[in-house]
Amino acid sequence: LGVINDELVFASKSTTEGMHVDLFKNLFQTLPTSLQEEIKELLKRNCCSMMFEVISQEDTHIIKYDQDHLYVLDMIQNTLDVNGKHIDVSFSRERLAELDSILKKYDTQLISIVKTIQQVNTMDELTNIINKELNSHHESEGFVLVDSNGFMTKFKGPYYNTWRYRRNRILRPYQ
C-alpha cells in the first residue's frame, strides 16, 4: 500500500490490477474512514509504503482462516537505496510504532501488526528453530525469518507444501 498523487495505491503480487488487488482494496476500505486517512497521512508524511499479508474469505487458501484480516508485515521507505542498504531497520521500527499508536485508537479486529514470536542470537538457535518448523505438520502456512538487516525470508511449512502439491496435482488436468 502506497500513496501517489494523494491517492492510495493498492498492489498485490507485483501489480496494481487483478483479483488480489481488489480483495485487498475492498478489505482495507471496510476500515473506519478516519483510520484509512490516518494511515494515508502516515505514508505520505514518511514517504513510505506498507507491506501486508491479506487474508480474505473470498480467496481460496490451503490454510483455513475463520475471518478476514490485514496483517501489516513492514513499512519501508520509497527508495531503492537507503544509506547503502536496501532496508532501514530503525525506520521500519519507528514507523510501525507510529502505526501501532494509531491502531490503538480504533476498535477494529481487521488489521494488526505482525509480532515477533522469537528472537535468536546464535546459528545453533536458528538451525534448531528451522528444523523444528520444517519437521512439524501443524496447520500453518509457514514462518518468516527477519535478519538484523531487515531482510525477510519466507519458509513454507510441510503441511502447506503437502496440500499445495496435492491441490496442484488434482487441478492440473483441468487447466
Segments from the language model and where they lie:
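Core nucleotide-handling region used for phosphoryl-transfer chemistry
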Residues: 1-175
